[in-house]
Design a protein with these regions (language model features):
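Catalytic-core loop-and-flanking beta/alpha module that positions acidic residues
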Residues: 1-269
Length: 269
């Protein structure tokens, strides 16, 4: 099965050159409701710590998506339903990430909680109520996050998008304790440094500690990318076609096709 992503020709060029897909932070997507509400007793805004790549499973052309993301002049990328390089964690869990634990400038990300899975959006009457349920107390000052459902709720009016998503979850960390361990000890122990970082995870998320990273890029599987299908938008020009054909030259098995609406929509400028 293929999945589909509507985007600009410029973005297609970046994807083909880098052979990566960009996951954008949830508090920067078009639907502000996905990130403005807090979750659980801590009222944590999980959109700061969730990164998404948005697709649709529907092979039927969606005029709303053509308009929203390309103004009818971009492309629709069609690719295998699992387009990324994946990494097996155990017999039951396959991750989008290779490393059990890696660090950004102010966050930690782990293969253990980032499943290689395409999550279907749930369209609901009250997204705020659903988002509120995503965090529960654990012990005195700990929290448990329902990670599989984070970033999966939108208001019913968005249902026209028929959206599915890949997701990445990061954990904010306070580097202060680790830095003190490194700077104040003559022979700092790696274990102690890591413990300082781990100790900061729960409090950092509960206090809505901001992170600076706005996107994360993940490698596409080159075998899947080689078989990519590109549909030209209804209002693309002959010059646009020439550009797309040039971009796909390194991918001889890729295919180009026209929108069923080609020549059937009026360009209003």
């Amino acid at each position: 099965m293929r999945i589909y992503h509507y985007t600009s020709i410029q973005t297609l060029a970046l994807i083909l050159k880098s052979q990566k897909i960009r996951f954008n932070r949830l508090d920067r997507v078009d639907d502000m409701e996905e990130s403005i509400y807090g979750s659980g007793p801590t009222q944590t805004k999980l959109g700061m710590y969730t990164f998404v790549s948005c697709w649709t499973k529907s092979c039927k052309e969606n005029l709303a998506l053509w308009n929203m993301y390309t103004r009818y002049k971009g492309v629709r990328i069609g690719i295998d339903e699992m387009p990324f390089v994946t990494h097996r964690v155990n017999d039951r869990f396959v991750s989008l990430l290779a490393s059990p634990m890696s660090f950004g400038p102010d966050y930690m990300i782990s293969s253990f909680v980032n499943e290689a899975k395409l999550f279907d959006m749930e369209y609901v009457d009250d997204p705020q109520a659903e988002i509120q349920k995503l965090i529960h107390r654990a012990g005195t000052d700990g929290i448990v996050v329902d990670i599989p459902h984070v970033g999966c709720f939108k208001r019913k009016e968005w249902e026209i998008q028929q959206e599915s998503r890949f997701k990445l979850t990061v954990h904010p960390v306070n580097m202060t304790g680790a830095a003190e361990e490194l700077l104040t000890k003559e022979s700092p122990q790696a274990f102690n440094v890591l413990m300082k970082l781990f100790e900061s995870l729960g409090p950092s998320m509960a206090s809505n500690r901001p992170i600076s990273t706005t996107h994360i890029d993940l490698d596409l599987d080159p075998v899947k990318l080689a078989d990519v299908e590109i549909m030209l938008g209804p209002l693309t020009s002959e010059a646009d076609r020439i550009i797309v054909e040039a971009l796909l030259r390194p991918f001889p098995n890729a295919t180009i096709c026209d929108s069923v609406f080609n020549g059937k929509l009026r360009d209003k400028g």
